[in-house]
Amino acid sequence: MPFKLFDVSKPIPERKEHTYVKHCGDP
């Protein structure tokens, strides 16, 4: 549980980059 909360509070850069690329690539 704490792990998920931490991930939401402070997402890792690797995950953020993946989301940014997906969002930018997805029209």
From Swiss-Prot:
The keyword Oxidoreductase applies. Keywords: ATP-binding, Iron, Iron-sulfur, Metal-binding, Molybdenum, Nitrogen fixation, Nucleotide-binding, Oxidoreductase. One of its GO terms (biological process) is nitrogen fixation. It is an enzyme of class 1 (oxidoreductase). One of its GO terms (molecular function) is iron-sulfur cluster binding. Binds 1 [8Fe-7S] cluster per heterodimer. The keyword Oxidoreductase applies. Its cofactor is [8Fe-7S] cluster; [7Fe-Mo-9S-C-homocitryl] cluster. Its EC number is 1.18.6.1. It catalyses: N2 + 8 reduced [2Fe-2S]-[ferredoxin] + 16 ATP + 16 H2O = H2 + 8 oxidized [2Fe-2S]-[ferredoxin] + 2 NH4(+) + 16 ADP + 16 phosphate + 6 H(+). Belongs to the NifD/NifK/NifE/NifN family. This molybdenum-iron protein is part of the nitrogenase complex that catalyzes the key enzymatic reactions in nitrogen fixation. Tetramer of two alpha and two beta chains. Forms complex with the iron protein (nitrogenase component 2). This is Nitrogenase molybdenum-iron protein alpha chain.
